[in-house]
Amino acid sequence: MDGTLLNSDKTLSEENLNAILKLREAGGKFVVSTGRVMQATRHYFEPVGVDFPVILSNGGMIYDCHENKVMWSEYLPEGSSRKMVSDLLERFPEACAEICTPEHIYDVQINEQERIHWKKGGFTAEIMESLDDVPDGNWCKVLFAMPE
């Protein structure tokens, strides 16, 4: 979506909105495919609607917006993912880990870069005291934010 459907200020341009409407008028269908998770995507396409399930997390999840349910997903391996995140947070204590599940976004070691990411992405996360507080299972994406 970034750099394609959305313009540089992360909004859906009038031109793209009109193109979607024109596509539908011609009998076409509109679908979204993005590296984002649902919480950082939904508010962009709700005004225009989608005709098919949305492809999220770089193909790691297919989500039916009409039924509000995950149709298919490939989650990160539980044990090794938690260990990797733990190791990286220990090595880079200034980093924030953003852990995404179908229902929640959790932040561990919140920092200013992550707060900027929230603002640009149009979402917020649940701030966790430690990685141990993040529930196991259904991690679909992990991002790291840190100062340059």
Annotate each language-model stretch with its function.
Residues 87, 91-148:
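Conserved acidic, metal-coordinating active-site core of Asp-based
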Residues 10-11, 17, 67, 76, ...:
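Short capping/connector residues at structural and topological boundaries
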Residues 14-114:
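Active-site phosphate-binding/coordination module
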Residues 1-10, 84:
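Asp-based phosphoryl-transfer active-site loop
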